Amino acid sequence: MSAILPTEADRRLLSDIKESITDMQQQMQATYSNLADLKLVGESHDKTVRITMTATYNFEDIEFDERALQGGVKEFKWRIREAWKNLCETIQKTTQSKTIELLQSMRIPEDIRNLSVEEEGGEGGEGGQGTRGMIGNPIASGG
């Protein structure tokens, strides 16, 4: 069996893919670092309890005023739970938004984008297609 040698175009494409992956990793690390610096607040419905964390779930502070203690321990725990839930939802929305921004701003070399176009004309179905046809395809990649 003889080995198939890669063409110059294949080597260039592989180089573009490697460079693109490295860029993506660097952008993801920068985004995570920015999220670590972003402080978010969750509040109870009556605004008597406030919990502050970073977007990477590092605890910063919890604040409450005397009104938060009205109704006893059960009510106080309920307000804390409410503020925590509000904070978690805020963190999730923020990280999702930042992730979408990151993905939309990523530079994808034209050769890689064209992979899906070239593959669409070929054979479909199973048989090791893997993720071919998904790169640069907003429907296949969930966007």
UniProtKB/Swiss-Prot annotation:
Source organism, top-level taxon: Bacteria
InterPro entries on file: YbaB-like_sf, YbaB/EbfC
Feature: compositional bias, Gly residues: 124-133
GO MF term (any one): DNA binding
Region Disordered, annotated ranges: 118-143
Record-given protein name: Uncharacterized protein CBU_0658
Source species: Coxiella burnetii (strain RSA 493 / Nine Mile phase I)
